From Swiss-Prot:
Organism domain of life: Bacteria
This protein's record includes keyword Chaperone: no
Keywords from the named record: Carbohydrate metabolism, Isomerase
UniProt-listed GO biological process terms: carbohydrate metabolic process; N-acetylmannosamine catabolic process; N-acetylneuraminate catabolic process
UniProt name for this protein: Putative N-acetylmannosamine-6-phosphate 2-epimerase
Chemical reaction(s) catalysed: an N-acyl-D-glucosamine 6-phosphate = an N-acyl-D-mannosamine 6-phosphate
Originating species: Cutibacterium acnes (strain DSM 16379 / KPA171202)
One of the record's GO cellular component terms: cytosol
Family membership: Belongs to the NanE family.
Length: 229
């Protein structure tokens, strides 16, 4: 790993990464709004911010001093999180310190393997690569392919694992044990409470990513509304 990669990974250790995303058509769907949200969560103690889309990545990068984890979503089915080398290059060029991409074993649209994608990206950019995985096997595959960080982002969304009501602790714990310090595991996906985040960390996660429960007021409002019915 490069010195840059080591520094970024060390800066995230034991911390909270906050995902600042709004979906098309939503009131908060604007790069400057997401940049303001990112500044707010940094003030609250986030060690990194995850942002979606080139405009958002660039805007967030200009507003925070913590690392920016960038993704580019194309659609919402199959491989859609930074699905090709072209997408990864663009996310890097937009200013991301960490490029998160699909780290599953599925075939990629540009015909490149995950290992080829990571190798080419790292040859061109001094960037950290996070693999968004859907299972333990995905995580081991992504580590072998050269990913610097292994995330549980896609657990429950690829058909390989059931969608748990909350974080997939089983995958988090298994990856930590199987990787045995070779790659940091980032717990992400359906972490909605501080207790859930704490449990993920206690299982050995390097850092925890929380999005909806912090930065998506429409969903949070719905949770309260439903509880009052």
């Amino acid at each position: 790993m490069s010195g840059f990669t080591d520094r970024i990974i060390a800066s995230m250790a034991g911390g909270l990464v906050v995902s600042c995303q709004a979906y098309p058509g939503e009131p908060l769907r604007h790069p400057e709004t997401m940049a303001q949200m990112a500044a707010a969560v940094e003030a609250g103690g986030a060690v990194a911010v995850r942002a979606q889309g080139l405009s958002d990545v660039s805007a967030v990068k200009g507003r925070v001093s913590v690392p920016v984890v960038g993704i580019w979503k194309e659609g919402d089915e199959g491989i859609y999180i930074t699905p090709t080398l072209r997408h990864a290059r663009c996310v890097s060029a937009a200013g991301a310190d960490v490029v998160a991409l699909d780290g599953t074993r599925r075939e990629r649209a540009d015909g490149l393997s995950l290992a080829e994608t990571i190798e080419r990206l790292k040859r061109e950019y001094d960037v950290v690569v996070m693999a968004d995985c859907g299972s333990v096997d995905d995580g081991l595959f992504a580590a072998e392919a050269g990913a610097d960080l292994i995330g549980t982002t896609l657990c429950g969304y690829t058909g390989e694992r059931p969608k748990t009501d909350g974080p997939d602790y089983e995958v988090i714990e298994a990856l930590v044990k199987k990787l045995d310090g070779d790659r940091p595991v980032i717990a992400e996906g359906r972490i909605h409470t501080p207790d859930q985040a704490r449990r993920a960390m206690d299982l050995g996660a390097h850092a925890v990513v929380v999005g909806t429960a912090i930065t998506h007021p429409t969903s949070i409002t719905g949770w309260f509304r439903d509880a009052l019915r």
